[in-house]
Amino acid sequence: MAAESGKIDPMHQFMIEPLFGQGWSIAGHNIAFTNSAMWMVVTLAALLIFMIGGMKRDLVPGRWQAAVESFTGFVAGMMATNIGPEGKKFTPYVFSLFMFILIANIMGMMPTGVVGVHPFTVTSHLTVTGVLAVISFSIVLVVGFWRHGFHFFSLFVPHGTPGYMIPMIFVIELFSFLIRPFSLGLRLFVAMTAGHILMKVLAGFVINGINAGALTVAIVSIPSFILMIGITLLELLVCAIQAYVFALLTSLYLNDAINLH
């Protein structure tokens, strides 16, 4: 947390700062290695370690193997339910997407500040969530046109629509389809940003109350600290829910592309 004139800035946690390579550039664009890039690398490393550690095929699985199998089974079940047998082809992608978002969200909640390394939630930036959403949307488009050609546009005309309403319904459905990547990326970005701001604001109340004296500690700091614990637990739940929602919506969009409904 950054402080100016004794005040804590809840937005400082979202600042992207270069760690090294400040002078690196390509075509005039700076490509320094930032704290955001570092935490994405850490997230990918954690995901890789998690998967490698659980790739054993013991007859009696250990806790690590059981955890990996539980996550893969959960995503595979979701794909089978939402898409059907063909959903199995896309399970690796949706699983990777789900686990990356989940681990990135949780990494941003880790109390690494006690050892001098400030946590950074990469999913609190629209550039990251937007790219993930665009990748998913691009896959949906490729799958849809690859399987159905121009018949893919029939997705935007619900079965049984009266002929005179087709132009209007087509435009409405097409518009709702095109805003999917924006809503998908924006939802995750807003959820992670709002929760983290609230936690920092409450932390500021706690610290400023302590600095103000004993009476303020009792009136402000203690209630804020208790509330902050509750919000932190809720935010951990939000981390999992948002990863699930992102993966769920991706599977539903893939179902539209595959089954045209």
Swiss-Prot record:
Return any one Pfam family short name: ATP-synt_A
Q: Which GO CC annotations does the UniProt entry carry? A: plasma membrane; proton-transporting ATP synthase complex
Q: Name one GO molecular function term.
A: proton-transporting ATP synthase activity, rotational mechanism
Q: Which UniProt keywords apply?
A: ATP synthesis, Cell inner membrane, Cell membrane, CF(0), Hydrogen ion transport, Ion transport, Membrane, Transmembrane, Transmembrane helix, Transport
CDD domains named in the record? ATP-synt_Fo_a_6 (cd00310)
* Membrane association type: Multi-pass membrane protein
Segments traversing the membrane? 31-51, 64-84, 97-117, 126-146, 166-188, 201-223, 235-255
Subcellular locations according to the entry: Cell inner membrane
Q: Which InterPro entries match?
A: ATP_synth_F0_asu, ATP_synth_F0_asu_bact/mt, F0_ATP_A_sf
Assembly state and interactors?
F-type ATPases have 2 components, CF(1) - the catalytic core - and CF(0) - the membrane proton channel. CF(1) has five subunits: alpha(3), beta(3), gamma(1), delta(1), epsilon(1). CF(0) has three main subunits: a(1), b(2) and c(9-12). The alpha and beta chains form an alternating ring which encloses part of the gamma chain. CF(1) is attached to CF(0) by a central stalk formed by the gamma and epsilon chains, while a peripheral stalk is formed by the delta and b chains.
Q: What does this protein do?
A: Key component of the proton channel; it plays a direct role in the translocation of protons across the membrane.
NCBIfam families in alphabetical order: ATP_synt_6_or_A, PRK05815.2-4
PANTHER family assigned: ATP SYNTHASE SUBUNIT A (PTHR11410:SF0)
Q: What's the family?
A: Belongs to the ATPase A chain family.
This chain's protein is named ATP synthase subunit a
Q: Which organism is it from?
A: Rhizorhabdus wittichii (strain DSM 6014 / CCUG 31198 / JCM 15750 / NBRC 105917 / EY 4224 / RW1) (Sphingomonas wittichii)
